[in-house]
């Protein structure tokens, strides 16, 4: 009997445990065996072939040894298939993986695509006796990554030959691994979120609570100090604090994910029948046409295209939805400064937050109906004239449900006494708190707030021609048309709120009168910020610095450059060719010169794509 036959018998009798003791014989076997397969050979050559007989017995040839095992009835579930089961080959020894040459193509005929998964110690090797053969089920965890998927695609030759977790079944390990990445928590109580409700991820309980609260006139009162802890176990203990936290995290009526809006529009276009659906489809057609015209604008500074598109054709309901969808998120300061604050730390916190909010404010303005159709000069002028008013009304709205508190960010909530550390800050805090109290008394609605915020921006350039140092708007008629559209949307919403005719007119006047108080606060805040800049007590960021200097230095030198030269906004925010982009304010003015930056220094908004704290928030 040859050495080769004797070695095969030894392996069958004693198993792979003795392989390390017969290494000389193994070296001779390698010289007698067929040539090793290349790693680049097709995947089918790396696996044993199947020959299924009619008698219900399948044979697998491996290393010139034949092992029979019972095959199931063809009428039942197949023994293995492309999408349910895969072979898992084990090493010939328990101390290391098998070599690539130890697997050979035995037999002929077509082979089902199999996925090669490295074996683990709990898998039985093929070299065991026939009773020890196993076919692993799909409950074995298979973790796929983009790199692994690409390599398998290269081996199999097509994407259809690769296995996916969905095809392999709902395995416990794989399912848990995939779901772990997609697990979201309620922004209000930190319970598991059931979906995206009213603008934030929330659970079913908080969604239903917020729905009940905004539908009725619920005047909740906190029995304590309006600072109750709202979590999974204590969310029902205080309705007032729960509703306050809902507003703090950004819940609002009509808050819908943008991708959901697109899905709803598509479904309506597909299934809409009847007169009512035809009207809705007609309105959607106008909106799509409007968006298409907005995206087709070229980089000529907007071209003053207000006359090319009538914004008044958009219905009031659609205007309200656009305004609510344009709202920026609530930011985090991410500043680790200990209390009590000093003058320097307080101003550092506030200026840092203002600089972050300015970037989001520009993205918000670009989403307003008709704003991108204005010339670049008009866009810059409106933003420079109203930026602090817009930031202040946003601060007041966030603080409306927190008496005595100003919510600058989710992790930066200040009260009146904390403003004492900065000279002149207490007066500004008092005015902000008084206006927030007025908002609370009027029970300002989210729809009314977004309209007032847009009116502040568009009304800021109405009297620019009165100043000798400021160039007037190039297309004041287009700005006035946008302002009328927003005002009509506000009047329409008030008329649908159930007020009597006289009460409607009174409420319109009450809301619009608030804007004069906000303008007064803005002027006070601008003077205070400019005095702090002159004292060099706190460094100002480039964007905030240029916005501040825009109120002091207004001497136009050259016409706005084309947007193609100055648009460096992130791809997600460059939705229109005529919009404000990083660097556009300085480029359009050509006049910002301050003690901290020369005339040729990097301009105002050039951080749009490079600042990590703002890039995620600007994505659509």
Swiss-Prot record:
In Swiss-Prot or TrEMBL terms, this protein is called: Estrogen receptor
Tell me the gene name: esr1
> Domain description from the entry?
Composed of three domains: a modulating N-terminal domain, a DNA-binding domain and a C-terminal ligand-binding domain.
* Region named Disordered: 1-55, 88-111, 286-308, 558-620
Q: Where is the composition biased (Gly residues)?
A: 298-308
Query: Keywords in UniProt for this one?
Result: DNA-binding, Lipid-binding, Metal-binding, Nucleus, Receptor, Steroid-binding, Transcription, Transcription regulation, Zinc, Zinc-finger
PROSITE patterns membership: NR_LBD, NUCLEAR_REC_DBD_1, NUCLEAR_REC_DBD_2
Q: Where do the record's region annotations for Modulating lie?
A: 1-185
Q: Which Pfam families match?
A: Hormone_recep, Oest_recep, zf-C4
Which branch of life, at top level?
A: Eukaryota
Zn-finger segments (NR C4-type): 186-206, 222-246
């Amino acid at each position: 009997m040859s050495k080769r036959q004797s070695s095969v018998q030894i392996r069958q009798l004693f198993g792979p445990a003795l392989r390390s003791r017969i290494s000389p014989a193994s070296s001779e076997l390698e010289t007698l065996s067929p040539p090793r397969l290349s790693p680049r050979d097709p995947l089918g050559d790396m696996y044993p072939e199947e020959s299924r007989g009619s008698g219900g017995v399948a044979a697998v040839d491996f290393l010139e040894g034949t092992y029979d095992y019972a095959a199931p009835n063809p009428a039942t579930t197949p023994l293995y298939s492309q999408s349910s089961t895969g072979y898992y080959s084990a090493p010939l020894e328990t101390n290391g993986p098998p070599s690539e040459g130890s697997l050979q193509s035995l037999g002929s005929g077509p082979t089902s695509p199999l996925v090669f998964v490295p074996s683990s110690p709990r898998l039985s090797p093929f070299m065991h006796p026939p009773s020890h053969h196993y076919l692993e089920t799909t409950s074995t965890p298979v973790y796929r990554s983009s790199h692994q998927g690409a390599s398998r695609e290269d081996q199999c030759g097509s994407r259809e030959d690769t296995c996916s977790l969905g095809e392999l079944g709902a395995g416990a390990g794989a399912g848990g691994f995939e779901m772990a990445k997609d697990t979201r928590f309620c922004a209000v109580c930190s319970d598991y979120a059931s979906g995206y409700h009213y603008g934030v991820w929330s659970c079913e309980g908080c969604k239903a609570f917020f729905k009940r609260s905004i539908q009725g006139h619920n005047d909740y009162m906190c029995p304590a100090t309006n600072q109750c802890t709202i979590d999974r176990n204590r969310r029902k203990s205080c309705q007032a604090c729960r509703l306050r936290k809902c507003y703090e995290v950004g819940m609002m009526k009509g808050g819908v994910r943008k991708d959901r809006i697109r899905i709803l529009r598509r479904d309506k276009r597909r299934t809409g029948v009847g007169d009512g659906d035809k009207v809705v489809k007609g309105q959607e057609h106008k909106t799509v046409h409007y968006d298409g015209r907005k995206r087709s604008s070229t980089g000529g500074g907007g071209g003053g295209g207000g006359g090319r598109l009538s914004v008044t054709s958009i219905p009031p309901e659609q205007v309200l939805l656009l305004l609510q969808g344009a709202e920026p998120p609530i930011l985090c300061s991410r500043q680790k400064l200990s209390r009590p604050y000093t003058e320097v730390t307080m101003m550092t916190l506030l200026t840092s937050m203002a600089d972050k909010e300015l970037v989001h404010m520009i993205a918000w303005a670009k989403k307003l109906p008709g704003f991108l159709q204005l010339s670049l000069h008009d866009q810059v002028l409106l933003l420079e004239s109203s930026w602090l008013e817009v930031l202040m009304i946003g601060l007041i709205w966030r603080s409306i449900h927190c008496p005595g508190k100003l919510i600058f960010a989710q992790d930066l909530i200040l009260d009146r006494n904390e403003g004492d550390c900065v000279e002149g800050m207490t007066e500004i805090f008092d005015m902000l708190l008084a206006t927030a109290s007025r908002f609370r008394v009027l029970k300002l609605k989210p729809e009314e707030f977004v309209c007032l915020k847009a009116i502040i921006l568009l009304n800021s350039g109405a009297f620019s021609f009165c100043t000798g140092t400021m160039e007037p708007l190039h297309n004041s008629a287009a700005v006035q048309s946008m302002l009328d559209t927003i005002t009509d949307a506000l009047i329409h919403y008030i008329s649908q709120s159930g007020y009597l005719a006289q009460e409607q007119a009174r409420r319109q006047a009450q809301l619009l009168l608030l804007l004069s108080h906000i303008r007064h606060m803005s002027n006070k805040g601008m003077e205070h910020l400019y005095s702090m800049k002159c004292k060099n007590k706190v460094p100002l960021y480039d964007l905030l610095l240029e916005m501040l200097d825009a109120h002091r230095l207004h001497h136009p030198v050259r016409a706005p450059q084309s947007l193609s030269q100055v648009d460096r906004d992130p791809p997600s925010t460059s939705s229109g060719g005529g919009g404000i982009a990083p660097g556009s304010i300085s480029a359009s003015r050509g006049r910002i010169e301050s003690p901290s930056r020369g005339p040729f220094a990097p301009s105002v908004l050039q951080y749009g794509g490079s600042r990590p704290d703002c890039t995620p928030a600007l994505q659509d």
